[in-house]
Amino acid sequence: MRFIAVDDGSLTKPFVKGADPASLDVWADETTERFLTPATIITFIRTIACIVIVAFAIRSGVPHDDEFWSPALKLLAVALVVYWAGDSLDGQVARRMHHETRTGALLDIMSDRFCSAAFYFGLAWLHPEFTIPVVLYLAEFMVIDFFLSIAFLAWRIRSPNYFYVVDATIYRLNWSHPAKAVNSALFAVLLLVTQAPWLGGIIAAGLLVFKIAMLVRLAKVGLPVPTGTGLADGSAATTEQGAPA
């Protein structure tokens, strides 16, 4: 597998052009892997808070008039802000406290999908005109983008935030700060601000096509089988030919 270490000016990571990837502070350390950290606790709290607020929004019921910004939708917007703010906070805490773990990254990715699905299902329930754009977006975010996001597990990096050592283009277009904003925030903001289902459909379809292109690029890079897989006790069960049983 070929690793890339480049600095094209768009990245602010602690490495220099031509650096040896092995020297970069991006690799997971099994001695520091654990389930509960300050960051994962924040992940659990912000996820629970978001889902509870969405539940209250749905309990408020569908508005009886044509009011767009109904009390229920306002609660959904609050849930969305809690999700985004919490997602930013847990990442910052993990990095600043040096508690980044692959477990935490995976929990964060899964929690993002849970919060996002809850918000968008609530939005489509309140405003059925958004159903098609929402379905397109969730197909992109919960299936294709989810697969892209967990692809880092095939390497020993700590999270997708360090995917630039595998492929700088995939990283820059998916997990740089501008890319995260476009993928996570643009669609929701446009729907809520413009109230235009057709525009949401165009954006969602565009994101879907783009993520499929990223999936094709990832397939060309290839997903290696991580070393260290096998029986939980580390013993090597093999066949007569020496292959894993």
Model-derived regions: residue spans:
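Membrane-helix interface and helix-disruption motif detector
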Residues: 64-68, 127-130, 194-199
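C-terminal membrane-associated helical module and adjoining short loops/tails
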Residues: 1-36, 152-245
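Membrane-embedded alpha-helical segments that form the functional core of polytopic membrane enzymes
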Residues: 35-103, 135-136, 200-203
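Juxtamembrane helix-capping/reentrant segments at transmembrane boundaries
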Residues: 32-36, 90, 94-115, 162-176
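Alpha-helical transmembrane segments and their membrane-interface exit regions
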Residues: 81-87, 139-148, 207-216
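Core segments of transmembrane alpha-helices
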Residues: 43-54, 111-120, 173-192, 207
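Transmembrane helix-loop junctions and nearby membrane-interface residues
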Residues: 54-61, 120-127, 146-149, 153, ...
